[in-house]
């Protein structure tokens, strides 16, 4: 009955005892107790009594013991850009083979039969322009490496200055010469086709082009969503050319230089934890934008530009061009993500997600007889506790939780990075699926040019797949060893 005694067999919503739950985000020398006030007791019919229940039991903040991962070798910036440029050259070469192939095995009485490609139909100025665009990252990496400061010997300094001058002069002269010829040969409408991909820079980068300072700004120095929104609104009134100039300057300085690795602060303040997560979230989004824009730009110039400027008398396999666009974009994305999201960076995101925690929305009717607290942003909430926020009930899912229950971005951050190997597993699945598709297409191909194309592209992906598998095996053993060691200590 309504006012009777609750039955002994009545099941309640899963909730850990508050006196046993502990959590931390700090170093080992910190401890704190955080009572939570304003708690309401709920009756069976869901009506509040209006009385404050006793505060949560005193909690000792025990530091999270993060796993120490080994240092994995990463390619230097120039070597990485050289490998990426080689993959793009291979894809561009096989595309030209598919466009300008000949029937060279025919007898001399049948035209044409002397070369495997119709070299006289190739526009070499367009080819030079495409190669320079694909080599933009490599050129910038070489120039940055040659511009390094420090105590260098005089012959070494002379060599670096000479190399930088030679690379810039050769690239600039070739680019200007090819552009002059293209302006004389093609219409303005056709040349606009070359500039179309650069229009992605503004919508992708202008809203976050100056939130990072190259190593000079701490992630905990007051970065928040309000500050970011104010900065975006301040930039909104600028004219298009100034935004374009600022975007290009920031993009080149960040994209072509060594990516500064953010730092992780094991702090006890929930507000500082949320600010650190906000900074890391913006940094991760910036890197993903770089991956997306660079991969789409490279795939566009490899797959579509040669087709657009081909002569009308030449047959073009449009299906193969679209397939090549997908292969190049996915391959470039995986290679860039492995370079911009190294294991140390993914481990950093995992630590921040472990400190942030997560909330899961629950049905209020299932927990009407369970103690529910009013969520406040000043406290760390233990696992299993129920809170009320924005007229909804949430259950704490993390070891302890400082995330905002209604913030979807916090939930996404925890979902992607609470497992340290999730990003690496996604990359392995993408690369493995692409290699499997290429092997299947290679077995089904009947034309000689498609066989050569698929084989060359396939070999260019093996190196990236090997590096991903190596990182997965090493990191998997490191994290599993740390988890087993923690379980043994608990038992």
Swiss-Prot record:
Transmembrane parts of this sequence: 79-99, 115-135, 152-172, 185-205, 290-310, 322-342, 423-443, 449-469
Key words of the record: Endoplasmic reticulum, Glycoprotein, Membrane, Transmembrane, Transmembrane helix
Membrane topology: Multi-pass membrane protein
Region called Disordered, residue ranges: 1-56
Mutant phenotype after disruption: Homozygous knockout fish for tmem39b are viable and fertile and seem normal. However, adult males have a significantly lower standard length and body weigh.
Tissues expressing the protein: Expressed in the ovary, followed by the intestine and brain.
Known role: May protect the cells against DNA damage caused by exposure to the cold-warming stress and facilitates tissue damage repair during the recovery phase.
Name of the protein in its database record: Transmembrane protein 39B
Highest classification ranks of the organism: Eukaryota, Metazoa, Chordata, Craniata, Vertebrata
């Amino acid at each position: 009955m309504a006012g009777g005694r609750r039955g002994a067999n009545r099941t309640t919503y899963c909730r850990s005892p508050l006196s046993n739950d502990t959590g931390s985000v700090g170093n080992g020398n910190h401890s704190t107790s955080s009572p939570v006030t304003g708690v309401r007791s709920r009756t069976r019919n869901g009506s509040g009594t209006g009385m404050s229940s006793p505060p949560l039991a005193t909690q000792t903040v025990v530091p999270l013991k993060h796993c120490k991962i080994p240092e994995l070798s990463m390619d230097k910036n120039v070597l990485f850009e050289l490998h990426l440029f080689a993959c793009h050259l291979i894809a561009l070469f096989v595309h030209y083979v598919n466009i300008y192939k000949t029937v060279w095995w025919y007898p001399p009485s049948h035209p044409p039969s002397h070369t495997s490609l119709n070299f006289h139909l190739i526009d070499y100025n367009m080819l030079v322009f495409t190669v320079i665009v694909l080599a933009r990252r490599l050129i910038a990496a070489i120039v940055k490496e040659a511009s390094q400061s420090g105590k260098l010997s005089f012959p070494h300094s002379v060599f670096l200055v000479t190399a930088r001058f030679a690379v810039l002069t050769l690239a600039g002269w070739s680019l200007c010469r090819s552009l002059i010829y293209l302006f004389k040969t093609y219409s303005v409408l056709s040349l606009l086709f070359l500039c179309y991909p650069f229009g992605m820079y503004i919508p992708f980068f202008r809203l976050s082009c100056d939130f990072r300072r190259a190593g000079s700004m701490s992630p905990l120095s007051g970065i928040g969503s309000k500050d970011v929104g104010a900065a975006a609104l301040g930039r909104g009134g600028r004219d298009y050319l100034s935004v374009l100039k600022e975007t290009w300057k920031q993009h080149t300085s960040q994209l072509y230089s060594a990516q500064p690795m953010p730092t992780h602060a094991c702090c006890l303040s929930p507000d500082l934890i949320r600010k650190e997560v906000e900074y890391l979230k913006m940094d991760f989004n910036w890197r993903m934008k770089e991956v997306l824009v660079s991969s789409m730009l490279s795939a566009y110039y490899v797959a579509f530009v040669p087709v657009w400027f081909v002569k009308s008398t030449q047959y073009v396999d449009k299906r193969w061009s679209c397939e090549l666009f997908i292969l190049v974009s996915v391959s470039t994305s995986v290679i860039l993500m492995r370079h911009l999201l190294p294991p140390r960076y993914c481990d950093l995101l995992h630590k921040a997600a472990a400190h942030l925690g997560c909330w899961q929305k629950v049905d209020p009717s299932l927990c009407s007889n369970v103690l529910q607290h009013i969520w406040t942003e000043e406290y760390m909430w233990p696992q299993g506790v129920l809170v009320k926020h924005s007229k909804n009930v949430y259950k704490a899912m993390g070891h302890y939780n400082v995330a905002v229950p209604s913030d979807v971005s916090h939930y996404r951050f925890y979902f992607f990075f609470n497992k340290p190997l999730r990003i690496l597993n996604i990359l392995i699945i993408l690369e493995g699926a692409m290699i499997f598709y290429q092997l299947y297409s290679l077995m089904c191909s009947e034309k000689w040019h498609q066989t050569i194309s698929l084989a060359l592209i396939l070999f260019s992906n093996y190196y990236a797949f090997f590096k991903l598998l190596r990182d997965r095996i090493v990191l998997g053993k490191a994290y599993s060893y740390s988890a087993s060691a923690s379980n043994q200590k608990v038992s």
